[in-house]
Amino acid sequence: MILAHDLIEKILARATNLDECIVIIKDQTQANLRWANSTLTTNGVIQERNVTVLAFISAGGKMAAGGVTRTNVDASDIDDLVNEATAAAKAAGPADDYAPIAKDWQHGSWDGAHKPTDSSIFKTFAPELGDLLKRSIAEQIELFGYAEHTHATTWLGSKGGLRLRDDSPNGRVEMTAKSHQRSRSTWEGVETHDFSNVSVSKIESAIKQRLNWQANKIDIPAGRYDTIFPSGSVADIYTYMLWVSSARDAYEGQSVFSKKGGGTRVGEKLSNQALNLYS
């Protein structure tokens, strides 16, 4: 496989008919473990590459732009990529909101290769997970979940001198537990960059504590009640709010942010409580 930065340079060298060309390559590897009914089910490593070519053509003081994205690109695909991006730009026509494109900016280790993640990231976690699964069977607790670690490296290069690189390692563990003939259930999750902060014993303690809490049941009549949300649930609700806050969906009357009679609820006061949300 051609190194990402070399492939970008080759594509840019072929984009002689374009006023500007931006190439973005993302190399990503992921290692994962999955389990169900307290038994490890699958594990493996996934590797992928995405190549995006953006073509820019000057037209009447404005700029037309178009792009294409492909996977597993090699040298023989370069001309087709450039031609397809060029055709997309011509079909799109000049953009009214065109702004000058940044030039001559470098960031990150441009020539360095992607450093793939692999199953060794679980060298401490996996044995501890195995012990937990054995204990859960003895205690009649069913565990379901997965652990994954992803390392994505993104390169962006342009004819105008942009040479940018970003490395983003991230991972997570998510585990669901069921007990007492599945009459009780709970969930625990951990975010991580390298699994050094993941403690299986802490996950186990949190799960058992929440399952034990569910032994105490209080019947509450139907009605309206004041509720205090823990911070984790607020984050989950906010994430979903972001997913459904598309301006177009709101304008077309397809979401909770749509105003009765048409338009959106932008500017409307949603709560009497002062609250700042950041993404």
Question: Where do the language-model regions lie?
Answer:
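N-terminal short leaders/motifs
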Residues: 1-19, 119-136, 241-268
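N-terminal basic/disordered segments at the start of proteins
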Residues: 1-41, 45-54
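Acidic low-complexity segments
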Residues: 4-8, 18-31, 76-166, 197-235
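A generic structural motif
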Residues: 26, 54-58, 176-180
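Short, ordered loop/turn segments at secondary-structure junctions
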Residues: 28, 68-73, 180, 232
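N-terminal alpha-helical targeting/anchoring segments
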Residues: 31-90
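Active-site-adjacent "lid" and substrate-binding segments of diverse enzymatic cores
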Residues: 147-279
